[in-house]
Amino acid sequence: MKQAVIVDCIRTPMGRSKAGVFRNVRAETLSAELMKGLLLRNPQLDPNLIEDVIWGCVQQTLEQGFNIARNASLLAGIPKTAGAVTVNRLCGSSMDAIHQAARAIMTGMGDTFIIGGVEHMGHVPMSHGVDFHPGLANKVAKASGMMGLTAEMLGKLHGITREQQDAFAVRSHQRAYAATVEGRFAKEIYGIEGHDANGALIKVLQDEVIRPETTMESLAALRPVFDPVNGTVTAGTSSALSDGASAMLIMEESKARALGLPIRARIRSMAVAGCDAAIMGYGPVPATQKALARAGITVADLDVIELNEAFAAQSLPCVKDLGLADVVDDKINLNGGAIALGHPLGCSGARISTTLINLMEDKDATLGLATMCIGLGQGIATVFERV
């Protein structure tokens, strides 16, 4: 079977969704700039070789509608002979884009793909136009479409305390801030033009969402936001609202080598899995178990792990049931996660994979896992191997 490899991976800085640096920048522009960036960074690649552009996006309406993958690829100047498709697996959309490209390569249906994802949550809110079928309440718990309440449920089932959630959130901000100050995000962030607080045009080079001042005391002062009476999940222990995009150049290994392109990682295995929609945040557990089995490895073989931090109350049960509680500080989200950086829905799968690959390089690691939960009860996971 042919091998799918990551040649390059980049992301935008994460902009705050409310009056942030990308308030005047459209989702198509964020996407197109990354597509152009991949080509500029890899001049050996003839753009005419691109088979398809596969782009994740959840709210496919307004500026993100009418196949944003094609709109962005045309804006980027990618040859019109390349295809383009927008995919939606909710939070796992751009990781699904990775999987779609990998499967195509493995089965001989192309050897060069640009993949990624975007979500401008400031321009297109998560709930915009959503209208659940009334009959869905006969199949799943009524609150299954309310992500915060599913996190509350999962946290309660696993005995996750408010203090544990707050500590996990503080860790996320501290690590993301340290990664910024120490330049550990520099290789993955591709600068994008935006606007400062005064409206001046600037080149944005750092994430805007991180709050280094976050402490246990400041989080303790926040009130539960989803279940005000009995809940423990606050805005501070939930993924931040942010705007951003991520992108990868994925190729068939021998083709990349023939062109003299770098091989940053190989896709070792992939998996998706379902779980009860009422505890959708548990999805990484069965998805990871599948991916590890397909790779022929165990969780102990993993050197670095990126687990998307939708909520602290969701992440901690996954850490526990995957047998990772004792290695959190050694292996998991070493540069912080979505609580600090935000979770632009369609962007996050390729974003955490990009962060993972850079961490693997920094630590000279061999095996890494990127995994995330998905609304309405799914999980998705990818095992990467440096070669």
Swiss-Prot record:
Keywords assigned by UniProt, alphabetized: Acyltransferase, Cytoplasm, Fatty acid metabolism, Lipid degradation, Lipid metabolism, Transferase
Entry-linked Gene3D superfamilies: 3.40.47.10
UniProt-annotated catalytic positions: C91, H343, C373
Function: Catalyzes the final step of fatty acid oxidation in which acetyl-CoA is released and the CoA ester of a fatty acid two carbons shorter is formed.
Enzyme class: transferase
GO molecular function, one term: acetyl-CoA C-acyltransferase activity
Known pathway: Lipid metabolism; fatty acid beta-oxidation
Reaction(s) catalysed (UniProt annotation): an acyl-CoA + acetyl-CoA = a 3-oxoacyl-CoA + CoA
EC code: 2.3.1.16
Name under which the protein is recorded: 3-ketoacyl-CoA thiolase
Highest taxon listed in the record's lineage: Bacteria
Gene Ontology biological process terms, A to Z: fatty acid beta-oxidation; phenylacetate catabolic process
GO cellular component labels: cytoplasm
Name of the gene this protein is made from: fadA
